[in-house]
Amino acid sequence: MIFLTLEHILTHISFSVVSIVITIHLINLLVNEIVGLYNSSEKGMIVTLFCITGFLIIRWIYSGHFPLSNLYESLIFLSWNFSIINMLPYLKNLKNHLREITSPSTLFIQGFATSGLLTQIHEQKILVPALQSQWLMMHVSMMILSYASLLCGSLLSIALLVITFRKSRSVVGKRNKFLNRIFSNIQYINEREKILLKTSFTYSINYYRSHLLQQFDFWSYRIISIGFLFLTIGILSGAVWANEAWGSYWSWDPKETWAFITWTIFAIYLHIREKKNAEGVKSAIVASIGFLIIWICYFGINILGIGLHSYGSFPIS
C-alpha cells in the first residue's frame, strides 16, 4: 500500500511540474526571454526527472522486475526518456528550443498514462512466462529508448517543415505587406535610408529563422541517429529472445512487421542525409512519415491486442 501511494504521489508531482514548465515556456515565447523563468524551467524538469526515476525504482522494487511489462509502465518509461533528452542541452550548457518539444511530449505521455483509460493495468501482476526472461530489460528498454529518440527527432523535423512552409507561403506575404505599409508612410526619407531599413529588417528575420531551422535540423539528425542505433539493437535482441521463447528469430508478428517498417523508414532518412546538400525538407518529410509509423508500431498494435506481443495491450471496452 505504501508503494502504491508513493507511485501515485510521484506521478502527480511530475505531471504538475511539467505543466508549470510548459506554462513558463509559453510565457518566454510571448515575451522576451526572462533568465529567472528559464532557470526555473530547467529546475522543474530536473524535479520531473527525479520523480519519474523514483517511480520506476519503487515499481521495480515492488514488482521484483524491471517495470516494462505492460503499456502503462512503458509509457512512464517513455516519459522518463523524454526527460533525459530534455536535459541534454542543460548538461552541455546550451540554450535551444529542444525543450519546447520534449516538455509537452512528457506531459502528454504521462497524462495519458495516469488517466482513467489505463487504470486496469496500473496494478502489478505476475509476469506471463514469455516475459520471465533476462531479455526483458535489454529488449524492451532499447525499443522504448528508440521510440523516445525517434519521436523527438521526428517532432523537430515536423517543426522544421512548419517553419519552412510558413516562410515560403504566408510569412513572405505578410512581411511584404508590412514593408509596403512602412514605406508608404516614410516617403520623405531618401532612397538610401529606405534600402538600409528594408535590408536590416529582412536580414534580422531571415537570420533568426535560418538559425532556428539549423538548430532543428542539427538536433533532429543526431537524435534520430541515436534512436536508429537503439532500434537496431532492440530488434536484434528481440530476435534472439524470440528464438529462445518461441523457437523462431522472426515470425512476421504485427509488432515485428511494424518495427521493421519503422527501421526501414529511418534507414531511408539516414541514407538521404548521407547525400550532399540533403539537409532540410526532404529528410524532414521522411522523418515526419516515421513519426506516424512509430505510433502505429508502439501504440496501435497495443490497442488492437493481436499477435505474440498482445500481452502488452490494454482493454478498450
Swiss-Prot record:
Membrane topology field: Multi-pass membrane protein
Keyword field contains Transferase: no
Entry keyword set: Chloroplast, Cytochrome c-type biogenesis, Membrane, Plastid, Thylakoid, Transmembrane, Transmembrane helix
A GO cellular-component term linked to this record: plasma membrane
UniProt subcellular location: Plastid, Chloroplast thylakoid membrane
Segments traversing the membrane: 17-37, 44-64, 71-91, 101-121, 143-163, 223-243, 252-272, 284-304
InterPro entries linked to this entry: Cyt_c_assembly (IPR002541), Cyt_c_biogenesis_CcsA (IPR017562), Cyt_c_biogenesis_CcsA/CcmC (IPR045062)
Major subcellular location class: plastid
GO BP annotations, alphabetical order: cytochrome complex assembly
UniProt GO MF annotations: heme binding
Pfam family membership, one: Cytochrom_C_asm
Complex formation: May interact with Ccs1.
Similarity comment: family membership: Belongs to the CcmF/CycK/Ccl1/NrfE/CcsA family.
Function: Required during biogenesis of c-type cytochromes (cytochrome c6 and cytochrome f) at the step of heme attachment.
Protein name according to UniProt: Cytochrome c biogenesis protein CcsA
Protein's organism: Pelargonium hortorum (Common geranium)
